[in-house]
Swiss-Prot record:
Cofactors that this protein relies on: Mg(2+)
Modulation of this protein's activity: Alternates between an inactive form bound to GDP and an active form bound to GTP. Activated by the G protein coupled receptor (GPCR) GPR1, which serves as a guanine nucleotide-exchange factor (GEF), and inactivated by RGS2, acting as a GTPase-activating protein (GAP) for GPA2.
Listed name of the protein: Guanine nucleotide-binding protein alpha-2 subunit
Keywords recorded for this protein, A-Z: Cell membrane, GTP-binding, Hydrolase, Lipoprotein, Magnesium, Membrane, Metal-binding, Myristate, Nucleotide-binding, Palmitate, Transducer
Origin species: Saccharomyces cerevisiae (strain ATCC 204508 / S288c)
């Protein structure tokens, strides 16, 4: 089910601004002060839109997850979702069968051309926002797979240099982390300091699509397999240095990727990482006469000054948050907690005058990585008011609450737990988003009350 969170209007609606960094933010996200309940939560009943009614619920206490009341399952339904985490036998977030049912009902909805006069196609402007590495570009790649017949052979080939750069970046980050924490090479290790220095200084030729250099591949592969490296990336210092989220995936597939005649798979492309710079407009035909102009903009601080250029006439904002970032700091500012940065950004977006009449879809992304991390890195270390332990449902609901309670502008917020690298998950999520757009358009046109 979708969830609309609303609150009373606040006179102050700040425009989007760069989140400030401070030493007090290191490692922990700030806990909001306790306030009088003022929000209402209403559950959207898409099965019977003619009988829809608003159901109100008091804002849960911020100090104890266990004490939060979930009237009519409003928050719980938003979390039961949209994604199933592969947790290797541990807890899993349950799939909401009702969400599957509602995605199948989309075809039965009246088309937008029936609800509006003029053009047969309804063109919608959608902004894809969020901090760096929250999964925005991966979501856009999934939409290309789902609605634009995927990647051409030429496009697949063009991803080879990027994936090679990702492998090289992994090697360099491992070497830098070992140096920072004074991790010496094992006595029996065949690598030398010269090997590490050569890897650090190696420059991949531009647009290179041949075989990955064998000598550099040997260094990275050997380095990753060292017990001291594994202790470092899985130990208490893991959150203190940067390592791209897809590192385990790429190292698991390292031999295949560095072999002759390498051709990237769809999953290789989805797992690749490239910082978005600039503004990219992608047109997606969603069916039912809906065309979505999706604007993907860079999430790093240096890119956010460009956001203002695409704020006019926005129908929908999709805001991406990485669930697994709760113990991480920004790549561009090692003193700023990533989760705190996302909260500040979300606050500025939902309470901005630019989006006073805009709906917001909140993607709580990377549920798979979140499930793996939760049992290793207690959330209580970063959120003193969280008491849900390693229960993934309680943890996800807590994070959702932290975002929803910022909605002073009374916007409609539709949260989804997502795994952007899972095509079937994103297909299901966008079926639900499409239905939300249909419903809102029909209401605006007077077809629905």
């Amino acid at each position: 089910m979708g969830l609309c969170a609303s609150s009373e209007k606040n006179g102050s609606t700040p425009d989007t601004q760069t989140a400030s960094a401070g030493s007090d933010n290191v490692g922990k996200a700030k806990v909001p002060p306790k306030q009088e309940p003022q929000k209402t939560v209403r559950t959207v009943n898409t099965a019977n839109q003619q009988e829809k009614q608003q159901q109100r619920q008091q804002q849960p206490s911020p100090h104890n997850v266990k004490d939060r009341k979930e009237q009519n399952g409003s928050i719980n339904n938003a979390i039961s979702p949209t994604a199933t985490a592969n947790t290797s036998g541990s807890q899993q977030i349950n799939i909401d069968s009702a969400l599957r049912d509602r995605s199948s009902n989309v075809a039965a909805q009246p088309s937008l051309s029936d609800a509006s006069s003029g053009s047969n196609d309804k063109e919608l402007k959608v902004l894809l926002l969020g901090a760096g590495e929250s999964g925005k570009s991966t979501v856009l790649q999934q939409l290309k797979i789902l609605h634009q017949n995927g990647f051409s052979e030429q496009e697949i080939k063009e991803y080879i240099p990027l994936i090679y750069q990702n492998l090289l970046e992994i090697g360099r980050n491992l070497i830098q982390a070992r140096t920072r924490f004074n991790v010496n090479l094992e006595p029996e290790c065949e690598l030398t300091q010269q090997d590490l220095s050569r890897t650090m200084s190696y420059e991949m030729p531009n647009n290179y699509t041949g075989q990955f250099p064998e000598d550099i591949a040997g260094v990275i592969s050997t380095l990753w397999a060292l017990p001291s490296t594994q202790d470092l990336v899985n130990g208490p210092n893991a959150s203190k240095f940067y390592l791209m989220d897809s590192t385990p995936y790429f190292m698991e597939n390292f031999t295949r990727i560095t072999s002759p005649n390498y051709r990237p798979t769809q999953q290789d492309i989805l797992r690749s990482r490239q910082m978005t710079s600039g503004i990219f407009d992608t047109v997606i035909d969603m069916g039912s006469d809906i065309k979505m102009h999706i604007y993907d903009v860079g999430g790093q601080r240096s890119e956010r000054k460009k956001w203002i250029h695409c704020f006019d006439n926005v129908t929908l904002v999709i805001f991406c948050v990485s669930l697994s970032e709760y113990d991480q700091t920004l790549m561009e500012d090692k003193n700023q907690n990533r989760f705190q940065e996302s909260l500040v950004l979300f606050d500025n977006i939902v309470n901005s005058r630019w989006f006073a009449r805009t709906s917001v879809v909140l993607f709580l992304n990377k549920i798979d990585l979140f499930a793996e991390k939760l049992s290793k890195v207690p959330m209580e270390n970063y959120f003193p008011d969280y008491t849900g332990g390693s229960d993934i449902n309680k943890a996800a609901k807590y994070i959702l609450w932290r975002f929803v309670q910022l909605n002073r502008a009374n916007l409609s917020i539709y949260p989804h737990v997502t795994q952007a690298t899972d095509t079937s998950n994103i297909r299901l999520v966008f079926a639900a988003i499409k239905e939300t757009i249909l419903e809102n358009t029909l209401k605006d046109s007077g077809v629905l009350q």
